[in-house]
Amino acid sequence: MRRGVVFMRTFGKSSKLDNVLYDVRGPVVDEAARMEEDGMEILKLNIGNPYPFGFSAPQEVILDMLSNVRTSQGYSDSKGIFSARKAIMQYAQLRGIPGVTINDIYTGNGVSELINLCMQALLDNGDEILIPAPDYPLWTATATLAGGNVVHYICDEQSDWYPDIEDIKSKITPRTKAIVIINPNNPTGAVYPKEILEQIADIAREHELIIFSDEIYDRLVMDGYKHTSIASLAPDVFCVTFSGLSKSHMIAGFRIGWMILSGAKNKAKGYIEGINMLSSMRLCSNVPAQSIVQTALGGYQSVNEYIQPGGRVYEQRDFIYRL
């Protein structure tokens, strides 16, 4: 430092974030906040956050958490408490996902944390991952942050927003490691038929890809459609299936999600070691929220009232469609 001259050190963001975008929160939301300050009325459809819109969790879930708070003050196993993982394992069985043990279940502070964990454990710089377009932005953001190259495949509006199978096939290269599906889809709402899922499973089988299946909306299916978990159709393909309680039980703020490993786990031993390492580094997901999983999955499913004719979600969906 020369006499009379002061050099001030400044800090910028990491270059790792240069190409990372997350529009659920970020510049778009900042601009919406500015517009609100200017007096404009903003309808916020950027995030699935039920509570501010008047949706509440089933009372028994709230009471169950309150009754478990005192015994939930310590860390749990990195994968989660036994009762939560047991309930999730049984849920997987009901969904037809074969060969799942309690050790294949990981709880997380929402599915978002687990998606980020999976991308960090899998991708080396330049590895490719197939992600639907349009997508839920977290998938692209976390894969990019992990050093991966995101390759978007088309979900065609003219074909009920189903994945374009030929487009998927055309975009696979020797560096492709995995394919992501979001089913039911966010943001399109499409529920994929079994035939589409089987074709995606065939592609993953042929090219030895991991399937990541984001199924957080699996219990919000209307009009007689049936949700099928792709892992139930691909017992020989390594699958990671994500779900949680944020949407179905209206408790996004509690931050409780999970992932289920199934299929050809013997082909992913090194990857699973990486998942275990990163899971251990964050110690555990929040224990009070874990304590309600058993009650939430086994008890009264209030979401069913909302998605039947006359229910709020059903009627609002129809109203918006008519507009």
Which residues does each predicted region cover?
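Helix C-cap/helix->beta junction micro-motif
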Residues: 38, 146, 206-207, 237
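Active-site phosphate-binding strand-loop segment of PLP-dependent enzymes
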Residues: 151, 156-226
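A short helix-loop-beta submotif of the ANL/AMP-binding
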Residues: 145-151
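Short acidic capping loops at alpha-helix termini that bridge into adjacent secondary structure
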Residues: 99-105, 125-128, 175, 236-239
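Conserved core segment of the aminotransferase class I/II
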Residues: 232-311, 321
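N-terminal small-domain helix-loop-helix segment of the aminotransferase-like
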Residues: 9-13, 18-110, 117, 284, ...
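Conserved PLP-anchoring active-site segment centered on the Schiff-base-forming lysine
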Residues: 121-143
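Short, Lys/Arg-enriched N-terminal segments with co-localized hydrophobic residues
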Residues: 1-7
